């Protein structure tokens, strides 16, 4: 194949790698955002449970205790309802990272191939030059005799 074809292929692989890396970063950021929000909601639920226990120990009204308990349960339910989304984003993040790594490896492989090809061509060129120089020297030696 011509060098131009390999250059275009290399550019395409670079673009593909850049896109997949950017996508991986976006998905990872979204996963972190949703996971942190979910952890924050769970933290609030624990805080309300602690407050509920303190209020119960202090003899707060039943209505107030029920309100605090219900709010804590609602927070837990919210956190639990988001768990599938968190897991889906975690999976998407892993897949996007794997794709980015594969694309980077493809690019690295092509670059390695092109470097070896360039070295091989350089060696052939040098070998050809050496042969031409030998021929010139041999011709000079033959003309002197």
Functional labels for PLM-detected ranges:
Residues 1-145:
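Charge-rich amphipathic alpha-helical interaction elements
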């Amino acid at each position: 194949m011509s060098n131009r074809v390999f250059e275009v292929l290399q550019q395409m692989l670079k673009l593909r790698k850049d896109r997949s890396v950017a996508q991986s970063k976006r998905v990872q950021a979204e996963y972190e955002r949703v996971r942190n929000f979910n952890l924050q909601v769970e933290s609030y639920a624990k805080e309300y449970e602690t407050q509920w226990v303190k209020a119960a120990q202090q003899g707060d009204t039943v209505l107030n205790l029920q309100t605090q308990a219900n709010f804590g349960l609602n927070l837990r339910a919210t956190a639990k309802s988001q768990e599938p989304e968190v897991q889906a984003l975690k999976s998407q993040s892993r897949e996007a990272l794997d794709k980015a790594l594969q694309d980077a490896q493809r690019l690295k492989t092509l670059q390695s191939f092109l470097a070896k090809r360039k070295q091989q061509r350089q060696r052939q060129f040098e070998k050809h030059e050496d042969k031409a120089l030998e021929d010139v020297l041999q011709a000079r030696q033959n003309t002197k005799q």
